[in-house]
Amino acid sequence: MSIEPGAQITVHPLLPAARFPGQLSEEDFLPLAYRAMYLARIIEDHLVELYHKGYVRGTVALGRGNEATAVGIGMSLRPGKDVTSLLHRDLAAHLLLGSSPYQVFCQYLANGESPTHGREGNVHYGDPRHRRLPMISHLGKMLSLVVGGTWAARRRGEDVFGLAVIGDGGTSTGEFHESLNIASVHNVPVLFVIENNYYAFSTPISAQYRCQLLSDRSKGYGITGQSIDGTDPWLVYSTIQEMFELMRRDPAPAILECFTLRLCGHAVYDKCEYVSKEQMERWMEQDPVPNVRKLLLDRQLADEEDLTAFETAAKAEIQDIAKRALRVRRPEVPTSDWGVYASGVLPKLAPVRTKQVKNGAAVNMALDYILKTDPRAVILGLDVGRYGSAFKTCKGLWERYGGDRVIDMPLGESGILGFALGAAQVGARPVVEFQFADFSTESVTQLALNAATWYFRCGWPMPLLIRLPCGSGLTMGAFHSGEFEGLWARFPGLKVLYPATAQETFEALVAGYYDLNPCLVFEHKLLYWSKSGDIDFDGDLDAVWRPRLYTEGSELTLVAFGAMVHEALAAVSKCGRSVEIWNPFVLQPLRIEPIIDSVRKTGRLLVVQESCRAQGLGDRVIAEVCGEVMGSLRKPPAILSAPDAPVPFAPELEAAFRPNATRIEEMITALLA
C-alpha cells in the first residue's frame, strides 16, 4: 500500500531537488525558491488563458500571492515519505513534490493522460501512492487523513512528519477541531499550516473568527503555535524546519499560521469586488514573486542575465508543454465498468469451524481472527478498548492485543473515519466501529464523498472495514435504533454487507476487512445475543460475496434484510406455504441475479425490511426485479416495512412499528390468495 521510506520521485528539471533534513542556507534556498514560484506563476497564467479560450472547463483556482508559502511547504517535505494534503493555492508545492507541469496541464484539461483520467478536474488531485493525499472541496476534511497517515507511518517505525494545509475559512469547520484533538491526544507530529489570506471566498476574517491570531488556538490543545509572514519564503521554510526539529525531539502536532495573499478572486470567475482598490494595491506591493526576484538581485544571489535566461527558458518550456497537453486524446468513455471499485487477488485464509456461536460472539471471533492473522490490523472507535465496546463485541481484544492495536479514540466520528482513511493509505488496515449506526451520519462527507470516490478519482485502493451496530427492538428510540443500510448502499464506491446469521456475520467482517474498498458491515443489535448458529468458514473470500438462500419454494420469493430474515423464517414455518427466502447480503454493489431467477420461478415477490419505506432498499429490489421479469409476475410485488416515521421509544409503539412474523404471514397469505 505504501512506498518504502526514501523512495525517489522525479521532480521537474527546472526545480530544486534538495530536501529535508539537510536544511539549506538562505543563500542557497532563495534562488531555488524563486524558480518554483516563477514556474507556478506562469503555469497558472497559461491555465487562465486556456480557460478563457474554452479549453479548461470548470474553473481555475489561482495561487497568485501564495507562492511563497507553497514553496516553503514543498521545500520542507520529503516526497514519498512525509504525509501531506495540499489545497487550492499550492501549485508550487505540488510541483516540488513530484507533479510535473505536463501532469498539471493534463489535469486541468481533463484529458486522457490527466492524473485522474478526466474523472476529476482542476485542484482535486494528488499522489496517494507517495503520500500526497488529494483534496476534496469540503474544506477541513483532509486534515484528519494526514493525521491518520502520519500515525500509521510512525507506527511502522518511520521517522515521518505530516503537514496538513487549511485556509482561514476552513479553521471554522468541526473537522479542524477533531483533527487537532486526535493528533494532540495521540501525539502525532503533524504541522497544521493555516494559509490566512484574509478572505474565505468573499467572507472576511472579521466574520470568520474573533481571536487575534488563529495560532492562539494551539493553547486549547496543549501544543505550540506560531504566526508568521507567509509572503517570505525563507521565513516559511526555516520556520517549518524548526518546528519539524521540535517534533522530532517531542512528537506532537503544532499550528503554523502563514499570513499570505490572494492577489485575485477565489477562482478565475471571481472579480474580487469585495476587496477595495487601495487594499489590493497594498497587497500587490507584497507580491512575493517580484519581491524575491528583487531580493536575489539586491543580495547578488543572481544577476539579471541569469534570471532572464531562466525565465525565458521556463516560458518556452511551459508554452511547449501546454501545446503538447492540448494534443492529448480525450478520456475514453467506459462501456460498462466505470472503475469505481478496486480489485485484486484475495488471500486464501485459514478455515474456521465452530458450533453454536451467538452473532455477537461471531463479531468478536472475526475481530480476533483479523488481529491475529494480520499485524497491520487496528481497531478504532469509542469505548472499544478496556470497556470492550458498547455491546461487548470487542471484549478481551484490548487485553489480548494491547492499546496500540485496539484504540479508544476521542469522540468525533468524522475525524475518526478520516484518521482511518489516512492510515489505510500508509500501510495500516483499520477497522472502525461506530458505536451505533445512527452515529455514522456524522461522517457522511468522509464516507460518501471521500472514501467512496477515492479509487474512482485516484486509481488507488482504500481498504477499510466499518462496523455499524444497527436496528430497533431494544427500546432505544430514534437516535440509537436506525438501520441506515438504505442510505449507505446508495453510494457507488462503498461496499455494504448485511448479515443475519453467525456464519454470515463472521464471513462479512473477514471478507470486508480483506477487500480493497471501504466496506460497511451492518450488525443488527437485536441479533447479537438472541441468535446462535454454526460457523463453517473455509477461507475462500471470493465465495462470500453472494446472496444467501434459507428456504427453497415455488409459490413466493421473499427477500428480507437483517433481523427480518428471522421473522420471515418464523412466518414461513408457521404458514406452511412454499416460500423461497433470500437475503441479498451484499447490498452494494447489489447482486440480485439469483433473486431474479427465483421470482421468475415463483411469479411473486415480497420484500420485508425493518427500515421505513422511504429509507430502505425494497423499492430498488422491486425495480430491478421488475425490469427483468415483469412478464413472469402473477401478482404485483409488495413491500412490508416500518411506517415512514422515526423509530419510537415506548415498547408498545416500537412493537407496532417493527414488521414481525405475524404481519409477514398475513402478507404471504394475501399474496397467495
Please place each PLM-identified region on the residue numbering:
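Conserved acidic/glycine
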Residues: M1-T69, M75, C258, L263-Y401, ...
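Cofactor-binding active-site loop characterized by glycine-rich and histidine/acidic residues
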Residues: D45-E49, K53-H186, P204-R210, S215, ...
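Glycine/charged-rich beta-loop-alpha catalytic/anionic-binding loops adjacent to active sites
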Residues: Y51-Y55, G121-I136, D159-A164, Y198, ...
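General beta-strand structural signal in soluble alpha/beta enzymes
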Residues: L62, T84-L87, T116-G118, Y125, ...
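Thiamine diphosphate
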Residues: V71, H130-K323, G385-P463, ...
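Phosphate/diphosphate-binding glycine-rich loops and adjacent basic-rich segments that engage nucleotide
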Residues: T475-V559
